[in-house]
């Protein structure tokens, strides 16, 4: 069994891969104040509930965009599994050529997604990850990571509107039927959600043009992350949603880097 750990700004996703399939996955809150002991208790409870034996874990790989949580998580791995985890970062074998000005600046999550997308599709691609931040990444047919862009996630946009506009309430991110709304809540929902979809469509259109100007074929657009399906249902610029893209990338990177 391989334990895959994807640390995001809001949630930590853990997956267990065994015999070419996923046998368990969990989502817990990211909390940099938790100690390694607290994470150890939580992870062991998850294993017990799933009736999994931690001694059968052969290896662990961690991808994180939250640096100050890594000490606790790495110690948790050592305590629970008596192994050193592979950590996605500078020096790791990826199989892709990162064309960033400073490759060390590329977030681990973006590298992991790019590896999975390229291994699976082997074509020019735009990868959109709808997380706390929304990231757009461009990959060539040869596997060059050209770069991309980062913008606030949908929830951040909603929170900012609530926090900075005194008379506007905090709202649930639900899709209204119309963009011509007759109350404050649905007006905010329409502006946030449909406005966000418009932003995605424009960025994808612009990225496609820039990639094709470089001689690439029209890129395939792959989306992942918690709100990917919401956006996918309202636009035709996304070709596919892959909710397990990051875990797939971690599994591929583990195989490339295990001793």
Swiss-Prot record:
Catalytic class of the enzyme: transferase
Q: Where in the cell is it found?
A: Cytoplasm
Q: Name one GO molecular function term.
A: ATP binding
**Annotated residues for binding of ATP:** 6-13, 132
Q: Keywords for this entry?
A: ATP-binding, Coenzyme A biosynthesis, Cytoplasm, Kinase, Metal-binding, Nucleotide-binding, Potassium, Transferase
Active site per the UniProt annotation: 109
Assembly, in brief, is: Homodimer.
Q: Which NCBIfam families match?
A: baf (TIGR00671), PRK13318.1-5 (NF009847), PRK13318.1-6 (NF009848), PRK13321.1 (NF009855)
What protein family does this chain belong to?
Belongs to the type III pantothenate kinase family.
Q: What is this protein called?
A: Type III pantothenate kinase
Instruction: Tell me what organism the protein belongs to.
Output: Clostridium perfringens (strain SM101 / Type A)
């Amino acid at each position: 069994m391989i334990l895959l750990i994807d640390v995001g700004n809001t949630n930590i996703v853990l997956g267990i891969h065994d015999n070419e399939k996923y046998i368990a996955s969990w989502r817990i809150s990211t909390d940099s104040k938790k100690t390694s002991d607290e994470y150890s208790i939580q992870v062991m409870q998850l294993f017990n509930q799933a009736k999994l034996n931690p001694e059968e874990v052969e290896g662990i790989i961690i991808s994180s965009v939250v640096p100050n949580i890594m000490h606790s998580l790495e110690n948790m791995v050592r305590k629970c599994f008596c192994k050193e985890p592979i950590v996605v970062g500078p020096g790791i074998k990826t199989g892709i050529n990162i064309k960033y000005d400073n490759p060390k600046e590329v977030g681990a999550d973006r590298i992991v997604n790019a590896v999975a997308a390229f291994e699976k599709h082997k074509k020019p691609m735009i990868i959109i990850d709808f997380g706390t931040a929304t990231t757009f990444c461009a990959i060539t047919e040869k596997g060059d990571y050209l770069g991309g862009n980062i913008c606030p996630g949908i929830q951040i946009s909603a929170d900012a509107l609530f926090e900075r506009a005194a008379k506007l309430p905090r709202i649930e991110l639900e899709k209204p039927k119309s963009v011509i709304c007759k109350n404050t809540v649905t007006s905010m929902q329409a502006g946030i959600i449909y406005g966000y979809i418009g932003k995605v469509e424009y960025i994808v259109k612009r990225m496609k043009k820039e990639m094709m100007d470089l001689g690439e074929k029209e890129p395939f657009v792959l989306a992942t992350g918690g709100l990917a399906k919401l956006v996918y249902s309202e636009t035709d610029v996304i070709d596919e949603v892959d909710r397990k893209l990051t875990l797939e990338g971690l599994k591929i990177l583990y195989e490339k880097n295990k001793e």
